[in-house]
Amino acid sequence: MMMGSQQIKRQPAWFMLASEFGESTLNEKGTGEFDPTFVITKLGAKVNRLIVSGLVERLELRETSNGSQMYNGQIRDPSGLHYFSVGEYASESMREFVIQLLEKVDSGEPVLLTMTAKARWYQTDEGAVYTSLRPEEACIIGRDRYASWLVSASDATLNRLNQHQLTLNCEPTAEAMKDAGVAQEMIPGLLAAQTHYGQIDTETYRLNVMQALDIAEGKLEAATTPPPTLNLTETEDVTEQADEDLRSVVLECIQAMDNGE
């Protein structure tokens, strides 16, 4: 029993902006039954769980191909969108929460949400990669707590940017990274990221951090109201609907994998 407890030890949760997580196209899974799955970001974070916050931009109930129900949602932070889904595999408390959340969103009430979630990853037959979240815990928050999360996520992102910077002038080996001052826990992810992503442009992440901190300090208006509805042309409307349908299919595939775990 003790060995089993060690095998399913909960992984730490990362504070992370949507842009870093959403751009990830690399995952890693061990060979053991209880080995965790990681999404590896361009900055070398090996993410199994993460803490996100933002405005609930969309939430809807859909019926999957096998007849079960799934809630698909989007959370917007200053850097972009996180996608999440809550299905029949979720805890009773989470399902009850998302039902209440849907009522608020449908009423037009702007809702700031924070959640701790498992990182999910799916690759289509064509090779496209999509990330999403499976919420573990979530709650509605106010501006002050959102500002606190923005500071925490910005600080964590800057730390990963600094760690990545240390690797630019050293050989892509664990020993060289250690000698360069890279934190031991970041080395495996940074090595994998270098191999998969190659040279990356980090300027967007730095701009995301600056904007997040400006919002936290009250210099910019936080996103607490839904964005205005655009008058789309018929072609644009069809394209947007196709994108949403594809995202729903992907989330349904991820749910099916979760149900099989």
Locate the predicted segments by residue.
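OB/S1-fold single-stranded nucleic-acid-binding modules
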Residues: 1-46, 261
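Structural detector for short beta-strands of small beta-barrel domains
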Residues: 47-67
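Residue-level recognition of well-ordered beta-strand positions that form the cores
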Residues: 53-55, 74-76, 116-118
